[in-house]
Amino acid sequence: MLLFLLSAVYPVRSANLFFSPRVPHAGSLIDVEARPGPQPPCEKEPVPAYPQLGEPALVQSWSKSDLGRDWKPPTCTGWTEEGFSTLVTIAARFPYTSEAEGLLRHIGAISQLAGIRYWSTTHKQWRTLIMNAYALTDSKPAQHREDFTPNEMKEGKVLYFEQFDKLTGKATYRMHIVEASASRLVFEVENVSTMRYYFLPILHPGELQSMYFLDRESDKVWRYYSIVRTGKNANGLIAGNDSSSVNRAVAFYRSLVGIPTTQEPPGR
């Protein structure tokens, strides 16, 4: 489990829409200058840049009209397929005073994903996103095991877990620990089984990809950056649902940094 809780309130700020904490379902448009494509904090400065500690997380849903249909993922992600159906980034700073091992322990606590809630734009209410989640001994979903420990999450390690999602049912995921040091954690997650909605395939293996970058800034502050992509061949049932993608990404961000997942305002 995560070893800390944030004492302050950190709502989510969209790059294109700002939600007032007092009126969580109302928004006001603000002008935003044209931005380059997303850039994780590797090789170059991150885009979008990190907000200051205490400011809302910066959440951005990127459009094909801005980036083009053949958008190429940043090289450091290792993703090779061009284009996307949905693309969401989150940049934030958060307070954390323990060592990186505590974050690794939380990341490896797969069973703790159960119960994560998100804002459903369809039902206009908070709903449970993850019903159950289990660490696996390998890519076979029948082999449940205890949560992963920090000692197992070494750089280069590949781990598997199973997740029962409210929206897409049961699926198996691969988690690759890209970097693991005292000051930087990088890991990527992608589905290795087909994801279905009422038995209808909506995402084939490798079509839901996410990458997370956690960097220590000081003894009390860490930086968070995530990029989540659904492939351009995703089923039309989810291909155009940007709000759902945003709210799912926000739910995982909040869970990781210790913010209650139902804290107002919702992501979008």
Task: Please describe what each predicted stretch is.
Residues 10-14:
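Sec/Tat signal peptide C-region and signal peptidase I cleavage site
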Residues 110-113, 217, 255, 259:
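Structured segments of extracytoplasmic/periplasmic soluble domains
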Residues 174-211:
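Hydrophobic-ligand binding "helix-grip"
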